[in-house]
Amino acid sequence: MNIKRNQNNSIDNNLSIDSNPSPIKKVKNHLDFSKSYNEDDEPSNDLDLSFNTSNISNLSNINGEEDNDDDDRENEPKDIDNPNPSITTTTATSTNSTLVKKTNNFLDFNFAFEPNKEEDDEEEDLNISLTTEDILLSQIELLKAEWDYITYNKSPPLVLQSVYHQSNKDSERSIQILKKKGTIRLFQIATSLNDYCIIITTDYIKNIELLKIENTTIPNKIKPETLTNNMKNSSPIKSAPIDTILLKRSEILDLFIKKLIPNFNEVSITRSKLFQLLSIVNDDHHQQENIITHLVQCGLLLQKDDCTFTFSVPGAGGFFLNLMKGRKEILSNIQRLKYKEILKKDLLKKKLKYSNVQMQLLIKDLLGLNKIKIIPTTQGELIRCVQFDEL
């Protein structure tokens, strides 16, 4: 009977402990993180029984001490190492919720792999602002940086089409895109029929603006044999009637910039088309001769025949002459070698006698014209002459 009473008392004690858990048990329940990870799962009876049977004696002792020392606990100073249970409960609860949130974020694949919206917006803005025209123009800008501004300061910076073709295999399509937009202009090199150079339109206009200030003509640019008999014998300003007001050079250049450049982007132009774009009446022959004279003297036009003119680059005659000399000198030097080939590093060390164009630029030019080719070797890049015909 005593054994049964003891068993009943122990069961009653267990029920009382479970129904009125102490603060310490509350803290332990809050610190039990397994409950937060498995909120939807049903509680395990085995775990609860093992906890109760293993800790009944300890919890009963703690409850007894709490009942006996209630009066003394009010007068005792607060221990820093043993904080207030309510505060501990709050801290544990917040820590528990933080861990649950981190765990949920870790398990939420949408949250983990969601891209940064601000970075996406910046990338979209960058892709929208960077067009095909900008990319192609940047390639020409890089090649333009190789221009010798000191030696050829009278000419706008230009890029040889052969050099651009060597760096961009789809150069023909790229040039047509930029040319159609009016971003660049194409000019035929006077010393060759199949050579062209590229000039950015803004650089071309800046160069023409400088011609307004200069009162003298560009030296070594206009030769008497390039002019027709009518232009040689005519003196538009003197022979014009008194009532005819001839345009000044600055006025003609303004018409050229504002009316011709935006509306015409070909290599050559006919006489009638030129005056149509400049809004010059066909019957006013004195004014027409006056305009042609000034444009030829400024180096903007070269007369191809009686009815056709080709556009030229002001001040670039010296560069084109040195370009042709440099091409021939390099090819002739390679042709004189036994195997008609030379290492690129050895060629770069040589100095040209008849040209002041940079050796690196001439090599790119000849590669673009398919006059030479580069073969990689163990000693470095080898330059071999492919053909040596009349340039």
From Swiss-Prot:
Where is the region Disordered?
1-95
Name the cystine pairs: none
- Write down the InterPro entries for this protein, in alphabetical order: STK19-like
Q: What domain of life is recorded for the organism?
A: Eukaryota
Low complexity composition bias: residue spans: 1-24, 49-63, 82-95
What keywords tag this UniProt record? DNA damage, DNA repair, DNA-binding, Nucleus
Q: What main location does UniProt list? A: nucleus
The record's section on Pfam families has: Stk19
| Protein's GO biological process | positive regulation of Ras protein signal transduction
Q: Where in the cell is it found?
A: Nucleus
According to the record, the signal peptide region is none
A single GO molecular function term of this UniProt record: protein serine kinase activity
Acidic residues bias spans: 64-74
| Physiological role | DNA-binding protein which is required for efficient transcription-coupled nucleotide excision repair.
Family membership: Belongs to the STK19 family.
What is the protein name for this chain? Winged helix repair factor 1
Organism of origin: Dictyostelium discoideum (Social amoeba)
Q: What is the lineage of its organism?
A: Eukaryota, Amoebozoa, Evosea, Eumycetozoa, Dictyostelia
